[in-house]
Amino acid sequence: MKIGVLALQGAVAEHLRMLEEVGATAVPVKRVEELDDLDGLVIPGGESTTISKLMHKYGFMEAVQEFGKANKPIFGTCAGAILLAKRIQGQDDYHLGLMDIKVERNAFGRQKESFEVLMPVADVGADYPAVFIRAPYIMEVGENGQVLAKHEDKIVVARSGHYLAAAFHPELTEDTRLHKYFLDMVKEYRS
């Protein structure tokens, strides 16, 4: 399985390492044409407005939308989850609009309110270490979506078909289970 990590901003190297650890061939994606031979894509965290502007500037917005519409799995973490969402609280532009979720940006506070917590994630396991940095939360999941985890009664991991969104940064831990879950999704959609 060949999985790309959108390499415009964020913890790209960390995602690449995690994907390699779970058995994927992981590559940074810096040009639109590099999407062509991928089985799945990770959109890492960073600053969602900045990533969105870079995606527009370099032609990734439409290309990633087509990638998703071709039933290729996409995993968005933190800002990547915001970009995947169909709806963003108080904002209508600068996102992919692929996953049937509604998100609120910076829902757990600013940089200084960052924290780490152990939490259960359905289909992944207990005691998953979740690192929240200026994290969003998922306000709503569409009728075909699945809530995989909550923190303080707020949805922080959801799946809808071939899309996976996490409000936190799984790549900033040593726990590879969520990346393994995504790799299994990619295998499921490839077969």
UniProtKB/Swiss-Prot annotation:
Residues at the active site:
C78, H169, E171
Record keywords: Cytoplasm included?
A: no
Q: Which domain of life is it from?
A: Bacteria
Alphabetized UniProt keyword annotations: Glutamine amidotransferase, Hydrolase, Lyase, Pyridoxal phosphate
Q: Name one Pfam family in it.
A: SNO
- Documented EC number(s): 4.3.3.6, 3.5.1.2
Q: Which reaction does it catalyse?
A: aldehydo-D-ribose 5-phosphate + D-glyceraldehyde 3-phosphate + L-glutamine = pyridoxal 5'-phosphate + L-glutamate + phosphate + 3 H2O + H(+); L-glutamine + H2O = L-glutamate + NH4(+)
Q: Which SUPFAM superfamilies match?
A: Class I glutamine amidotransferase-like
Which InterPro entries does this chain map to? Class_I_gatase-like (IPR029062), PdxT/SNO (IPR002161), PdxT/SNO_CS (IPR021196)
Q: Write down the CDD domains for this protein, in alphabetical order.
A: GATase1_PB
Is Nucleotide-binding found in the keyword set?
Answer: no
The protein's GO terms of the molecular function aspect are: glutaminase activity; pyridoxal 5'-phosphate synthase (glutamine hydrolysing) activity
Functional pathway: Cofactor biosynthesis; pyridoxal 5'-phosphate biosynthesis
Give the GO biological process terms.
glutamine catabolic process; pyridoxal phosphate biosynthetic process; pyridoxine metabolic process
Q: Name one GO cellular component term.
A: cytosol
Q: Where does L-glutamine bind?
A: G46, E47, S48, R105, I133, R134
What does the similarity note say? Belongs to the glutaminase PdxT/SNO family.
Q: Which NCBIfam families match?
A: PLP_synth_Pdx2 (TIGR03800)
Q: Describe its assembly.
A: In the presence of PdxS, forms a dodecamer of heterodimers. Only shows activity in the heterodimer.
Function recorded in the entry: Catalyzes the hydrolysis of glutamine to glutamate and ammonia as part of the biosynthesis of pyridoxal 5'-phosphate. The resulting ammonia molecule is channeled to the active site of PdxS.
UniProt name for this protein: Pyridoxal 5'-phosphate synthase subunit PdxT
- Name the source organism: Brevibacillus brevis (strain 47 / JCM 6285 / NBRC 100599)
